[in-house]
Amino acid sequence: MKLEPMIYTNDIANSIKFYRDTLGFEIDEYYPNDETPTWIAVRIGNDRLGIGRTFPDIKYKLHPRGVDGSGVQFYIKVTDVDEFYEKFRNKVEIIDDIENKSWGDREFTFKDPDGYLVSFYSKIK
C-alpha cells in the first residue's frame, strides 16, 4: 500500500512550471498526455504527488477549498536543508525563513502557486 496525495489547481500549466522548472522535480506521469494535461504526478524521491483539475464525471463533491490551500502542508525531508534553502530562496516566496525549530527540525516554508504550504527540513544534528 502506498499513499499518494492529490491536490487540485485551476492552472495545471502553472503547477507544472513551478514543480518541474522552479523546484526541479520530475513529472512522472501526464494525463491524458504531456501536451494538454489535466492531471500530473510529480515525483519527489520515492513518493508522488498528484496535481490536477476536477473532472465533471467525479460523483462526489470536493470540500470547498479554503484560503490559499489552507489545511495542507507538505514536509519534504532532505539531508542538507541549508543547501535546498540556498537553491530555492530566490525562486520562491519564503513565508517562514530557515531556522531551527523547537521540535528538532531545521526547516523553511513557502507556498506553491495555489497556496499549498511546502516545507523542506532536516533533523538538527
Please identify what each model-predicted range represents.
Residues 13, 20, 99-101:
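Generic secretory/membrane-interface signal
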